[in-house]
Amino acid sequence: MAQQQQQQHLQQQQQQHHQQQQLQQLQQQQQLPQYNNNLYNLNYNMEDPERRKRREREKYERQQGIQSDDRETSLFEAPRRLNPSEGDNMITAALGEFVDAKEHMCMNMVGIHRQAPGGGSNARLQGQATTPIINSLSSINSTTTTSSSASLLPGQLPTSQQQQQQQQQQQQHYQQQQRAPTYLKQADNKPPYNGRGGYPGQPMKNDIPSSSGMAPPRGPPRSASSSSSASNNNSSSATNNATAAAATSASTAPLLGPPMSTQMPNGREKSYLGPPAPALSNGGRFVPPAASGKRTSNTAGLQPPPPEKDISKIINEMTNSYRVTPLTSIAATPHAPTRENYNLNGPNKNKYAFDDVEPIGPLNSPPAASGASSSSLSCTTNSSSSLLMTPLLAPIAPITSPIAPLLTTPPQASQLPLPLPLLPPLAGATTVLPPALGMAAVAPIQQLMPTPPKASPTPPTAIRPLKSEKNHSLEKQDSCLENDLELSESDDDRKRDICSAGNSSNSSETDSSESGSEASSKGEAQQQQQQQQQLLHHQHQQQLLLQQQQQQQQQQRATATTANGGNKKKCQTIIASGANTISGLLTSSGLGGSGGAVNATSNTNSGLLGGGGGSGSTGGGGGSSSSGMGNMSSSSSSNKTPSPTDSNRWHLSRFFPKPTNQATAESVSPGNVACGNVSMKVPGILPGGAQIIPESIDVTTAIVKNEKLHDDTRRITDDEDEDEQQQQRYAAGLSVTVKKEQQEQQQQQQQQQQQQQQQQQQQQQQQQLSAEQLALAGALPNNQIKREVRLSDSASISSGSASGSSSSDSAAGEVVPLPGPGETLQIPGVPAAITTVLRVPPAMQQKVPPNSVTLTPIGPLPASPKPRQKKPRKKKMSAATAPPLDSSDEDEPASSNKKHALELAATTAAAAAAIAAAPAATAAALPAVKKGRGRPRKQQQQLQQTQSGNLSSASAGSLAKGPTLTAAKKPLAKSTAAAAAAAALAATALTVAGSRKREHSSNSSSNGNTPTKKLHAAPATVAAAAAAAAAATTLLPPTAAAGSSSDEDSTSSSCSSTKSSNSSSSGSDSEATATTAAAATTAAAAAAATTTTTQNPAKKRIVKINKLGVVSSSKNNRLYGAGSSSNSSSSETEEQQQQQQQHKQQQQLLLMQQQQQQQQQQQQKQQLQQHQQQQPLQPQQQQQQQSHFTPDAKQARQRSSSSDGSSSSSTDSSSTNSSSSSDEVDVHHGGGKRKSDKKKICTLTRIFNPKEGGAKKQGQVVIIDQSEEQLQQQQQQLQQQQQQQQQHQQQQQQQQQQEQQQSKEWKPRATPTQLLGATLASPARTTTPHLTSLMCKIDLSKLARVPPEWYQKSYRQYAAEQQQQQQQHLHTQQLHHPPHHQHQHYQQQHQPHQQKAQQNGHLSSRSAEGARTPKELQQAYGMPNGYVTSGGAAGAAGAASKLLGGVKHEHGVKPEPELDAGYEAKYKPNSVKQEFMPKQEMPTRRRKRSSSSSPYKEKKRKKEKADQVSKELLPVPVLLPANNHERLSRDKLELLQQEISSANGSPTKRSFPLAHAQQQQHQQQQQQQQHQPQHQQQLKATTTTSTTATVAAVQTSTTATQQPTTCSEAVQTTPPPVAPPPPPRLIYRSHFDNEEEPPSDDLRKNEILLQEAIRRKRAADSERDSFKQMTLYLEAIVYFLLTADAMERSNMEATWTMYKDTLTLIKFISSKNRPYQQSTNGKHESHNIVAILSLRCQSLISLKLYKLRRANCRAIIASCSEFFRTGGRGDILNGNTLSSISPSNSVGSQGSGSNTPPGRIVPQDIHNQLCRQNEYLTYVNSAHDLWDQADRLVRTGNHIDFIRKLDHENGPMTLHSTMHEVFRYVQAGLKTLRDSVSYPQSQ
């Protein structure tokens, strides 16, 4: 009844007011225009002029119909960030939309109404109007309806209110029609324009806010669910509802927005029409505009103020209707189908997507059960929004659930109490989500239809967080990188497309929309606090993770087992953890969670969901994501960077072949690298594929410090020491560190001490390991061990896990993240400065001990000594060796205790090995033996003496070390000799790994790198070595035993010159002491030594070197040396030769018995022992022959091997040891193959200091072992013939030589290197076939030819007094031993130099083509006085003159060893003089060679030698000038020669009269005494030569010897002073002389190259001077080319991109230079030359691009040819035939077809192929065209002389030039240009 009464009452009121309404309508119609004008004016005046203009412009556009409803627009056309600060977002989130609040305050509180009071056009106003306008149909009072509607949920509009809305709409329409024409939209039936705002159905500029006077609301348009937007005409999302009812009725209650699926990105709604539209009075032509609720008018006269409301009502309205409702992602996120309308490629590159992620509550709070306010992004959302949100989570959860397992909940997630099933996104991603951002998307909700998760077509991996923004810091901070590589936008667009396919919208965190959404989502301060807490919590977790990571790293480091994998993981957390550091962005989280933590820290700033989550995940795919999450997080991390799957992107990980165990972990998605807040300080990837190369990360010690941030985690305890050790070992083996040499030297000294300490500690630790444990350690995974070896000190670890080091060799194939230039580990996926290719062992850059030479064998070296023969030694080892093992390790002089402990382990292991083939244990012991790179030799010697017993370990160490020497070049060399020793000895199984290691370690032939042989040999060698050592120790007197052990030790040390050349010498010193002691008992000791040598495995090695040296030294040496050499060459030939030599030696012994009965006895014993051992055990024969311990043999070995082996002058014995060790290895290899003397190689390597050994300081030496057997046989024959003749003469000559040597040679003595340099430099250089400027080719077969006379002379020189005391006629044995022992240190200082000089000079004349002796070494070499004086003295005339002649002639003389007589004849003084003197070309050639150290000159020299290729055997160790500046003018050389000759004048003059007879006699006597076939051959030849010839040769040789000591001087001084310099002649070189430098895959090197390129480019960008700018640009180009060349070996696509971008850059540079090229005046000549170089570079780059695509081009040509051959298909006779193809268009097609010419239909694929072919062939065409342009410019600019000079010095640049040659050429040209510009007088 009450209702009926109310209805009646209402009806009465309606009737009563019906008339009033009509009157009011009329009044309103009259008042509206005025009201509108006033209101508009007010609003207009309230606005600032900027908005006024904008609105006017928009109004005009709307009136003109410029913007149509149907036009598809991105969510925001051009996001404008007025204040893109986080503070604005926070304010907006806190305050809500101020527009709505303002409107409410104006209407409800202040009472300002924007409509006439009777208008009732606004629901709010109507609800508040005193006299609401009520439709006849309406049954409810407006006030009650409004109040009730306020409480109603959206969408529940009461029917009365709907009726009222209809009535209002009709009235409004009527009123609008009554309005002034100015506001009437005229022809297009659009609702009248109310002054501002869009028409209800017309979307308006999204950014334009209501006239609130505030900045436009940031973020996406407010969705219909937001209450305030409903009343805003211009809010597209609200007004675009199909009916105005929804818009107007949203007044008091927020409308229920359309379902998420219908929300369109442009604000339009696709399917949801909202509440049904009321019938429109205007026929529905258009929705009447909602009364502009934004206009506030102060004109109270227009309408009565609304009745004042109760404050409680106002507050209720504010809280209910106008509460801050932050934008829900539902309203904001476009629906998945919107991809159709959402133009991802459109101008709006920063698209806005809003992720539906539940707000991150406090970590400890359980997730809200309902997805309502707690799960929704806004905690303040109304019940309506919560209702909306709850259903949304349902589809999201299953969709993201597949991601959850991928996320492998990071430790953060695991720590969260949140259950995964309830909140998979939280568990998987949001935990990592930087809470500050709070909006990271777990899954692209808008992309996913609400279909069940299984139905979702996209795989979970495709799901990517929506927030993938391009970091503006990347874009804007360094725009230079855009230019650095001339990145193409097409790549960016294409990659954005790829990303956009995954992400419906790429939202940038900093974008206004996202910030707005975030702000709204953050809503309350509570959320912000929670987020902050979460951030703190995340950071805390990350710190914990970092700590855990460090602990884990330490643990891993502690255990050598995880050497590879664990260390890699550790290292991969690059340089410093932190938000901005590389670790955050780049770490491919090796330890999933821990790495992720680092990433999370870095990403907290960027707020990438994937950043934390992915990083936490084990995969560690990128800075932001684990590999498992890979695509998802990576796309989230960057907007423009393509998904990591994009092929064109430079995936840094591509350049790192990933070890199998870390294939996934190391993958770093480039997107992640470029994520969020990445600054240019962090390496990353720019959109075009350019990499961000942080300049701050320089290759300096600072990096080492940075690395220690993480590495200290690994190396907390002894890491610092180990780091130094690593640096040392890298320096010794590979010189990995880029640190400057001075610093390195200082560090090395410190490091050596630290190493010794560390080694002691490690050894002590390792001692605990039993042989079994060592073997097990060897069984550890190769990659782990390998990694361990590299990261930690290779030596220390190898000693710790010797087998581990060996296994690391086997893992050499893997590319391990190597310590960066400053020890900084570089993550394989992300090099800090460069995309690098496979790591190539860096050439030794660190300072190597001055005496050490790193042999980088180029080409196959002669088979390394076979380790097999050590098996018999095993037996001996097991019995006798165990007790003495303690002392033998010479490697660690400092830590004898450690050695002993290790050796004890080694002894036990050795016994086990000998018994049970457990050489692994011995190997482990051996690696323990490893010593620091540089150790005082004396200490080592003392240790050796004390520890002489440990032959097995010493030999094993030597074996291992030998390979490391030769392998110095290899990365495994880092593991150092200890690793090699461990590899060889670790286990028979490990021996395979050891062989691998040796193979990797430079395929050092010395170690018998042939893995098969190694397999047999390594265990055999270990056991055999140990057994032989034991036997030797037992058999020999303690002195002899000590000497033998020291020999092996020294050999091992000498071989392992990479670790410590000094150590080798120290070993030799100890040996020397032992030998001196043995010298006392020359005969007995010799006999014992013979017996022991037969038994000593170490002596085998010596024998190998002795092949050459021993044979030359004496009969015994011959027996041993010949046998050993023959063994190396072939077992059969060895036996025969040995037998022959033994017979010869026996004959000689008979002759010698008259003079030396003691010697005869010793020799006979040695012979018998040798025969016995040689016949049954050829492999052991070398060991036996190593009996060089017999004074003669030992001395000879020491001479040959130590002169070769121990670059340090002091170590003869070390060289012998090296020879013995090599012999042992050879024995193991088997007699069938000759193998280069390991010790020789080692010694030679030491001789050539890498500092001076190569232009690149790589000090590479090629040692070639050539027909030693033939030479020996020939020598034997000659010896037999000459022995009888020369016996009598030798005595006299020896006496004379001794006198002369003592008196004369010491004074003038020039270092043998001088001789070598002078005589050998020119021919030898030219001969080096493969090596550019770095190599010295040494023919080991020729090393054997060092005349024993020379040794005798040297010994006589040094110990002439003793010789006289003992017997003047004592021959090689006594002469060698007693003086050798007594004066051994003295001899070591000089004899090795003599030997080296002879071997270097003599050998160099034969074998060493490119060997460079460092200046230090050259100076160090005491020129054996006997050598010089022998030339000068008549008594010494014969052999000495031959040596001199040979050595000097090595210069010009090109002996052919094949011709015995001819070979000798060439060494005849006459021939020498003729070749040397008359060949005036040679000095000029030398001059040209010396003119520049460039490899091209060496190539020229090679070409000159090409004529003399047959004479390749010239083993001249050419001393190449360190640089061009060291070249001496001819006058200076002559002066120097004259001075030296004047100093030596008397002896030389004396030598002339001594004449032929004395020379012959002396030679014969020496030959008889030494019975060395080589010298006999030479002596015979010399005897035949005339006295004048000898004198001339002596003169020339003396002059050569007198030449300056420095390498450059030696090289340059070679021309004889007499002959005038011949006119320079053109030197041509063959294209095949082009020897590419060995490609360096060293990561650090490539990084440095790229850094240098970018640094120069940036410098050029900022340079103002045009010439300097062009030169800098061009330098940058060549560095880019080197980088691309390095990349070419790993990733062709990246290489293509690099070359292409470089070509674009150089074209741009050339365009800048063109204005200067035009003028040919002298002012711009330099510009023309730069242009020439630039054009040539462009030509070569174009040609390179074609070559890279040559295979594709061939395929294209084949397919196209096939197509054209078959005639194709679809020939069109006339255009009308098209009608048949498309009959539907027959009418139009006929008309158009008549105009089309006849043609052929080409398939699309053929067309595409033709296009590509055109591109590729264009490169070829442009290459030749550009080259022709350069040539024309050379001619027209008169630059022919400049280019010709440049060509002569550096080799001509041709289209066949490699990038390294281009680099050298361009750099040389630019340097010349700069010099000419800076010092024009030089021109």
Curated annotation (Swiss-Prot):
Residues 1-45, 140-154, 161-178, 223-253, 362-381, 500-540, 626-639, 796-813, 939-962, 1124-1145, 1170-1186, 1200-1222, 1362-1376, 1385-1399, 1558-1583, 1595-1606, 1783-1794 have a biased composition (Low complexity). Coiled coil: none annotated. Residues 609-625 have a biased composition (Gly residues). Keywords: Developmental protein, DNA-binding, Nucleus, Pair-rule protein, Phosphoprotein, Transcription, Transcription regulation. The modification Phosphothreonine is found at T458, T1548. Residues 1-88, 140-311, 329-381, 449-540, 609-654, 796-827, 844-901, 922-962, 992-1018, 1039-1075, 1115-1145, 1170-1238, 1358-1413, 1450-1510, 1543-1583, 1595-1641, 1783-1803 are annotated as: Disordered. Belongs to the AF4 family. GO terms for cellular component: nucleus; super elongation complex. Has a role in transcriptional regulation. Acts in parallel with the Ras/MAPK and the PI3K/PKB pathways in the control of cell identity and cellular growth. Essential for regulation of the cytoskeleton and cell growth but not for cell proliferation or growth rate. Required specifically for the microtubule-based basal transport of lipid droplets. Plays a partially redundant function downstream of Raf in cell fate specification in the developing eye. Pair-rule protein that regulates embryonic cellularization, gastrulation and segmentation. It comes from Drosophila grimshawi. Residues 867-877 have a biased composition (Basic residues). This is AF4/FMR2 family member lilli. It is found in: Nucleus. InterPro entries: AF4/FMR2, AF4/FMR2_CHD, HMGI/Y_DNA-bd_CS. Residues 930-942 bind DNA. Its main location: nucleus. Residues 481-491 have a biased composition (Acidic residues). GO terms for biological process: periodic partitioning by pair rule gene; regulation of cytoskeleton organization; regulation of DNA-templated transcription; regulation of lipid transport. Residues 450-462, 1614-1625 have a biased composition (Pro residues). GO terms for molecular function: DNA binding; transcription coregulator activity. The modification Phosphoserine is found at S488, S490, S887, S888, S953, S955, S1546.
